[in-house]
Amino acid sequence: MFCRASVVARLVSPAFLLIAGQAAALSFPLPPPGEDVVGEVRVIQAKYEDTFADIAKANDMGYLEMVAANPGVDPWLPGEGRNIVLPTRYILPPGPREGIVINLAEYRMYYYPKGENVVYTYPLGIGREGWGSPVTNTSIIDKIPNPAWYPPKSILEEHAAEGNPLPKVVPPGPDNPLGPFKFRLGTPGYLIHGSNKKFGIGMRVSHGCFRMLNDNVLELAKMAPVGTKVRIFSEPYKFGVSQGQLFLEAHTPLDDHGEPSVVDKHTAVLTALHNNEQITAGYQLDWNVIREVVAGEDGMPAEVSVPVSSVASTEAEMPF
């Protein structure tokens, strides 16, 4: 039987365990070519009044990734002194390390400043069921501080039908859903922006736009110029290499039509493997561990291979 605790135990070992102090923005030096993993899993102790929403905001985390990394812990009352895992180790997304990269399945953005050997990463609120965020390649076409909000017709109609009508314009200020800053994307109708709500970052809550913590969106505003490329995709299964070992990071696949079946998830893993043959070739995979990681969906990289010099995994070895 799969035990999610076994995966966490491998990750939160003495080599990786850091007791978090004051939170800082999540940024990491880029690893050298051929390396894909950044950060380390951290652990903090909850205070009496803490909730996962509080802890997530203080540590640049999203709500659902906190829940996934801490199975069995009450997110509204973790308990004073309870050890809380912060899943701050990441496999960098596949593809070019440039501009803004958003992985919807992670509820997370990665930003690679041009000419710098660093990556910043931020949690996101994304489009809820029926209002999914787009999968596309686009760019930032405008930057607007202290924006007013002009609700589109579809949102006005939705709120009116719910008996909660909106004004045609919401001025800048603490009640503005866009927060202190917005980026307009080349994909019509979509924004990256702040928020007037404490809750919702790292969840499916928006009408398709990308919500950030206000401190995060203001930090990004100082760095990302108009013209910055934005690549948006949804990949729940990321493979990457670190120190000669192959790792897999698994998240819950997004599906507007219900929970994906086990077969769907395994098919997605095989697709991710084929899409990453340039890094997975040369490794013999431990399929027992892969099954654990896929079932666990805890969002933390786990080692899934035994390195070999001449034997590559083939579909004949796959136990699905």
Question: Which sequence ranges carry the predicted segments?
Answer:
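LysM (lysin motif) carbohydrate-binding repeats in extracellular/periplasmic proteins that recognize
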Residues: 47-76, 118
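Primarily a LysM-type cell-wall glycan-binding module
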Residues: 27-60
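Bacterial N-terminal signal peptides that target proteins for export
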Residues: 1-12
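Gly/Pro-biased beta-strand-loop elements
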Residues: 90-198, 219-222, 250-251, 256-320
